[in-house]
């Protein structure tokens, strides 16, 4: 599970990522980092995977922490991954890259809990909750055509924006 606010420990980036898979070699770690777009900032750090993290990852931004936690989850080789608003601190362009990379993990079931419609638009199924209960289940296209709650959320989030969530 990857949460909106995850835990990072004092130690190196490598040590933190190996909590996901203690046997992972650097090649495997970098592959997970690329999928989570963590390579984008790690490659600019002088010590890369050996960069020391403060307790809680306080020397990283919120988005950087989230990307490391996504990479750590990917290293676990789980059959089911739960992403609970795990890209909320990531800009939309980076989130789009992460979504595209996660699509390559075809044998992994991904449950995405999100507030941004762009996070779920291209998923197989979207479950709309209302007052803690399942309101409707469908694809983006089905819900946009038939569900007033989804239509309202979509309209409010897409107003003024041009991110259609597509995987160009």
Language model: regions and residue ranges:
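ABC-fold ATPase nucleotide-binding domain signature/coupling loops
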Residues: 2, 39-68, 86, 90-93, ...
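ABC ATPase nucleotide-binding domain "signature" region
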Residues: 61-62, 68-73, 97, 112
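A short, proline-enriched helix->beta-strand linker immediately N-terminal to the Walker B motif
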Residues: 75-79
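C-terminal portion of ABC ATPase nucleotide-binding domains
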Residues: 44-48, 100, 121-168
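Catalytic Walker B motif of ABC-type/P-loop ATPase nucleotide-binding domains
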Residues: 81-84
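ABC ATPase nucleotide-binding domain helical subdomain, centered on the C-loop/LSGGQ "ABC signature"
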Residues: 14-55, 99-100, 107, 167
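Conserved catalytic loops of ABC-family nucleotide-binding domains
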Residues: 102-114, 120
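Conserved catalytic motifs of ABC-family nucleotide-binding domains
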Residues: 6-24, 60, 119-120
């Amino acid at each position: 599970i990857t949460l909106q606010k995850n835990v990072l420990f004092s130690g190196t980036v490598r040590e933190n990522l190996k909590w996901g898979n203690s046997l992972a070699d650097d090649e495997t770690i970098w592959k997970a980092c690329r999928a989570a777009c963590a390579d984008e900032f790690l490659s600019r750090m002088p010590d890369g995977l050996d960069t020391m993290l403060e307790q809680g990852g306080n020397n990283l931004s919120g988005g950087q922490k989230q990307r490391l936690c996504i990479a750590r989850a990917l290293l676990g080789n789980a059959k089911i991954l739960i992403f609970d608003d795990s890209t909320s601190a990531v800009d939309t362009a980076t989130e789009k890259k992460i979504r595209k990379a996660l699509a390559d993990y075809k044998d992994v079931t991904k449950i995405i809990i999100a507030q941004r419609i762009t996070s779920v638009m291209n998923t197989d199924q979207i479950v709309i909750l209302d007052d803690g209960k399942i309101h409707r289940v469908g694809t983006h296209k089905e819900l946009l055509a038939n569900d007033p709650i989804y239509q309202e959320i979509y309209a409010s989030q897409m107003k003024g924006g041009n991110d259609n969530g597509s995987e160009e």
